[in-house]
């Protein structure tokens, strides 16, 4: 009768669930209030005009318009702003 000694158990074999972070709406896209623009950990992108920030650093639209991404300041901060619909239609 063939016998094999029992193998030891392992403490590996798990992985965390993906958090679905990233940019959800891109520059030039039309947006309405409440839409999520960026899901992030920390402030990779900063809130500009017409954009709010949630407690988990999620950026969301506060006004209707078109999204604009910009790099500003001495530290090269990335800002997300919204050009309001009234300005877009007037241009």
UniProtKB/Swiss-Prot annotation:
Belongs to the bacterial ribosomal protein bL27 family. This is Large ribosomal subunit protein bL27. It holds the Pfam family Ribosomal_L27. Gene3D superfamilies: 2.40.50.100. One of its GO terms (biological process) is translation. One of its GO terms (molecular function) is structural constituent of ribosome. Keywords: Ribonucleoprotein, Ribosomal protein. It comes from the Bacteria. Signal peptide: none annotated. InterPro entries: Ribosomal_bL27 (IPR001684), Ribosomal_bL27_CS (IPR018261). GO terms for cellular component: cytosolic large ribosomal subunit. It comes from Pseudomonas syringae pv. tomato (strain ATCC BAA-871 / DC3000).
